[in-house]
Amino acid sequence: MYSEWLKGTWMLDSFTAADEEGETIDYMGAGATGFICYSNDGWMSVQIIKPDRMRYDISDVEGGTEEQTISAARGMFAYAGKYTVDEENAIVYHHLEFSLIPNWIGSTQKRYITKESDNVLILSADPVRMGPGGNKRKSRLRWKKADIT
């Protein structure tokens, strides 16, 4: 059921994180953009960027100052690897082989699937420390199926 439905490209609609008191933040900032892809051969990739990432002074690959390079890394969230789906419990497991966060390489990230509609996917995770104050927050990413036209 979910395995087939997930396949394809989904565009980020929102990325929020709520703490135990219910305070919600836009984790990557209002207007964050990105996509997640689930391929037919069992691979997935996600890329998310903040809307206000600092641009490099020049357009070379290594053209940024140290401050610009740090800002670019902090303004992006990305990983890829194989995925498996637990149909019964509506969970997708991301088995990471690549990640902007080095400590996540080799890990498995569990995401709870909610099918809001045929074209809207919600992925949420167990609470982790993220955002201001280092509070534990539960992330909720809302994705819309990419337009193929």
Predicted regions and their residues:
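Lipid interaction determinants
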Residues: 1-149
